[in-house]
Amino acid sequence: MELEAMSRYTSPVNPAVFPHLTVVLLAIGMFFTAWFFVYEVTSTKYTRDVYKELLISLVASLFMGFGVLFLLLWVGIYV
């Protein structure tokens, strides 16, 4: 197969929206991270729920992870 016959790969996400995605995803991730820390500090060991802790931390880590991914793409580190 020749190089000219191949179609050029285009990203499913427009690079012009990388800054906006970065800010939004990191802001949402920081909100859930702050919620997790406030929940840990204000609850006693009797009122804590491990499933709620896991859910909040999972959502926070997903948003922060994708936010960091788009931050890397925004600054030109293509992973």
Curated annotation (Swiss-Prot):
Pathway assigned in UniProt: Protein modification; protein glycosylation
Q: Which GO terms describe its biological process?
A: protein glycosylation; response to endoplasmic reticulum stress
Q: Name one GO cellular component term.
A: membrane
The source's superkingdom equals Eukaryota
Q: Does the keyword Transmembrane helix apply?
A: yes
List the molecular function annotations (GO) for this entry: oligosaccharyltransferase complex binding
Indicate how the chain sits in the lipid bilayer.
Multi-pass membrane protein
- Bilayer-crossing residues are 17-37, 55-75
Please tell me whether the keyword Nuclease is annotated for this protein: no
Give compartment(s). Membrane; Endoplasmic reticulum; Cytoplasm
Arranged from A to Z, the UniProt key words for this protein are: Cytoplasm, Endoplasmic reticulum, Membrane, Transmembrane, Transmembrane helix
Q: What does this protein do?
A: Subunit of the oligosaccharyl transferase (OST) complex that catalyzes the initial transfer of a defined glycan (Glc(3)Man(9)GlcNAc(2) in eukaryotes) from the lipid carrier dolichol-pyrophosphate to an asparagine residue within an Asn-X-Ser/Thr consensus motif in nascent polypeptide chains, the first step in protein N-glycosylation. N-glycosylation occurs cotranslationally and the complex associates with the Sec61 complex at the channel-forming translocon complex that mediates protein translocation across the endoplasmic reticulum (ER). All subunits are required for a maximal enzyme activity.
**Family, as annotated:** Belongs to the OST5 family.
How is the quaternary structure described?
A: Component of the oligosaccharyltransferase (OST) complex.
Please report the name of this protein according to its UniProt entry: Dolichyl-diphosphooligosaccharide--protein glycosyltransferase subunit TMEM258
This protein's encoding gene:
tmem258
